[in-house]
C-alpha cells in the first residue's frame, strides 16, 4: 500500500485533531485553550470566557497601541 492510500484511508477527523502550534490560528488556539479550561474545570463557565478573552482588556490595549502609533507618526513628521 502506498503512502497516499494510507493517508486517504485515514479518518479525516482524526487528522484534523492532530493539533500543533504551527497549524493553529490565534482564534483556534484560544478556542483550544478555552476547551481545555472547561474540561479541567479550571474556571467556572461564567468566568471562563472573560478570563481567556477579556474584551475590556483588549479594548484598553488597542487604545494604548493607537496612542503609541499616533505618537510615533507625529514624531516622524517632526
Swiss-Prot record:
Job of this protein: Required for cell cycle progression through G2/M transition at temperatures higher than 33 degrees Celsius. Component of the chromatin structure-remodeling complex (RSC), which is involved in transcription regulation and nucleosome positioning. RSC is responsible for the transfer of a histone octamer from a nucleosome core particle to naked DNA. The reaction requires ATP and involves an activated RSC-nucleosome intermediate. Remodeling reaction also involves DNA translocation, DNA twist and conformational change.
Signal peptide location: none
The protein's name: High temperature lethal protein 1
Location in or out of the cell: Nucleus
GO process annotations (BP): chromatin remodeling; G2/M transition of mitotic cell cycle; nucleosome disassembly; transcription elongation by RNA polymerase II
Gene: HTL1
Broad class of the protein's primary localization: nucleus
N-acetylserine modification, residue list: 2
Keyword Transcription: yes
Remarks, miscellaneous: Present with 3550 molecules/cell in log phase SD medium.
GO cellular component, one term: RSC-type complex
Superkingdom of the organism of origin: Eukaryota
Subunit structure, interactors included: Interacts directly with RSC8. Component of the two forms of the RSC complex composed of at least either RSC1 or RSC2, and ARP7, ARP9, LDB7, NPL6, RSC3, RSC30, RSC4, RSC58, RSC6, RSC8, RSC9, SFH1, STH1, HTL1 and probably RTT102. The complexes interact with histone and histone variant components of centromeric chromatin. Component of a fungal-specific module (HTL1-LDB7-NPL6-RSC3-RSC30) within the RSC complex.
Keywords tagged on the record: Acetylation, Cell cycle, Nucleus, Transcription, Transcription regulation
Protein's organism: Saccharomyces cerevisiae (strain ATCC 204508 / S288c)
Amino acid at each position: 500500500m502506498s503512502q497516499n492510500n494510507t493517508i486517504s484511508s485515514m479518518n479525516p477527523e482524526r487528522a484534523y485533531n492532530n493539533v500543533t502550534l504551527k497549524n493553529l490560528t490565534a482564534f483556534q488556539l484560544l478556542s483550544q485553550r478555552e476547551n481545555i479550561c472547561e474540561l479541567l474545570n479550571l474556571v467556572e463557565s461564567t468566568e471562563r470566557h472573560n478570563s481567556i478573552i477579556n474584551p475590556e482588556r483588549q479594548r484598553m490595549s488597542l487604545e494604548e497601541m493607537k496612542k503609541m502609533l499616533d505618537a510615533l507618526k507625529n514624531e516622524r513628521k517632526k
